Amino acid sequence: MSQTTSAPVPPPAGFSDVKGWFWPADQLLFDWFLKRQEKFPEQAGDLLELGAYLGKSAIFTGGYLRPGEEFTVCDLFDSPAPDDPNSAEMDRSYSTLTRRGFEANYLAFHEELPTIVQAPTSVIASRLKPDSCRFIHVDASHLYEHVHGDIEAARELAGPDAIVAFDDFRAEHCPGVAAAVWGAVATMELKLICITGTKAYGTWGDAEPVRAELLEWLKSRTDLWHGVEEVAGAPLIRIDGKKAKAPAPPRPLRPVAPPERPAEPEPAAPVPVAASQGLLARVLGGRRRR
């Protein structure tokens, strides 16, 4: 059963206070890919995130939204999934604790919420236009069948040269993600550009110029190790970000004062040594008289 609440959710004081798993190396790569797209006006399109949790990566991604574009986030937010994904229930806004947390977190950094589709990611292809997205972050279910469906939707929604990021690509507890992504490389013409310790980045467009520019940028980064291997007939850039220095984080719209710590009680006054010794002597003396 989903957990609902009407109580206000306190906003985070800063980006580091938003719960989630979005490591510095991937923040750097999101920043690099999205800023690169700004250099090519013809690479217009919307932003899409499948799976949001409490919004850490969505907050980051939303900062690259350009005028006239739309940012869509699709997540169940702990609401029950109906048997019929096309039912009217899919458009209901369940006030779950997770969704309220996402909204409070996102609005702490942005004036407006993204378009929220509170539904299984299997519906997203029916909600957006084909070839409409320039950047897609797939971070929803870890089950192979679901990830495979998310990849199919991403391929349909991705515009020319769109970048697609896949989370938990190398996590030992998520073999279905790796299987689905490599399956897409083998059978769906997905071209991987690079991988980090957690994510894979690819495109259905021309990967070669992106890969070449990324390699030049990586040469300038002393905090990122990288190597290139031939995998499935194409170069794949491996990136180690253990020492990565994250880019400047998104800044809250309105500074939030950290919660005040409750005042500590004053320590009790110490008992004078002489008085305590006298009390002990009287107690012992009374015992002897008995």
Question: Which role does the model predict for each range below?
Answer:
Residues 25-36:
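A short, well-structured juxtamembrane/interface segment
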